[in-house]
């Protein structure tokens, strides 16, 4: 245990005192979805009370969304936010432990598409939903944030926008982005069993249910394979040394840099996949402050 480098809260999490539900399979998916929501609901309620943000359900381009608004709006630009869950679980509500603090810290409204999930709605349903909302937001300055599968979603939407000649966001923040569904990167071997929130088997199951028999090298499925250039916005990527998808963040950062994109890759010692979801951990709070400062630095006057 890296006691000298981790907060007491992070150490407790790594000791499995607060394990998140896991074990994805098609037969148990409904139970896993319910268990995960029950697990995170107390934290969501606590965060909503402490941040004093408000939420309401809206519809944008026929896609149901959750709008998160700070008590005092100080930013004229919205944030398009993609929630995680391997495209087979998760919801806008469950990601409020990240989205609500970001909303309060930036003073910006967040729009979280409630995109359709696999296996009921496999690819390209989620990306279609995300891109529909993207199209409604992109005519004015805006930012994108996505965690895990939500990072995949916002990247894929940006690549679609680039191909269509639509405006790109002014800045994008990606938290442990699942940007490649080919489960063969180095960290997916050496961090399997070390990451308390994600396993290689869970990831393979999600990839199979989401992509089916489609070519996973398709940039709409694995956006790391997309065509990037210097027109892409500045990007902040966060990950941890225990993150099962650490290698994906490293590879994406290198790909973007080689394409002329401004990238800030922040690798947190001893932390795991989307550690920011655990709002009680001081490192998560600091990472969200970093993300908020990054977004405000690129969008605020």
At which residue positions do the language-model features occur?
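A glycine/proline-hinged amphipathic helix-loop "lid/cap" segment
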Residues: 1-71, 301
């Amino acid at each position: 245990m890296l006691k000298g480098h981790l907060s007491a809260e992070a150490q407790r999490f790594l000791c499995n005192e607060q394990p998140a539900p896991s074990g994805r399979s098609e037969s148990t998916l409904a139970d896993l979805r319910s268990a995960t929501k029950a697990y995170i609901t107390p934290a969501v309620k606590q965060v909503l009370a402490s941040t004093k943000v408000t939420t309401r359900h809206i519809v944008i381009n026929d896609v149901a969304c959750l709008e998160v608004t700070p008590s005092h709006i100080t930013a004229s630009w919205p944030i398009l936010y993609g929630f995680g869950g391997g495209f087979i679980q998760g919801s806008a509500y469950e990601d409020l432990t990240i989205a609500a603090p970001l909303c309060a810290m930036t003073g910006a409204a967040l729009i979280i598409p409630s995109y359709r999930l696999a296996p009921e709605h496999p690819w390209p349903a989620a990306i279609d939903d995300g891109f529909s909302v993207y199209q409604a937001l992109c005519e004015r300055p805006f930012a994108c944030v996505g965690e895990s599968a939500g990072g995949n979603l916002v990247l894929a939407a940006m690549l679609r926008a680039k191909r269509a000649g639509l405006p790109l966001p002014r800045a994008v923040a990606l938290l442990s982005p699942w940007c490649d569904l080919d489960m063969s990167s180095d960290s997916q071997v050496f961090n399997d069993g070390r990451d308390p929130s994600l396993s290689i088997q869970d990831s393979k199951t999600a990839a199979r249910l989401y992509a089916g028999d489609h070519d996973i090298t398709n940039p709409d499925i694995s956006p790391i394979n997309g065509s990037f250039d210097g027109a892409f916005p500045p990007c902040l990527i966060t990950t941890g040394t225990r993150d099962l998808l650490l290698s994906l963040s490293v590879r994406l950062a290198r790909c973007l840099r080689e394409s002329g994109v401004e990238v800030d890759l922040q690798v947190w010692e001893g932390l795991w996949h989307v550690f920011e979801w655990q709002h009680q951990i001081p490192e998560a709070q600091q990472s969200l402050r970093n993300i908020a400062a990054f977004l405000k630095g690129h969008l605020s006057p």
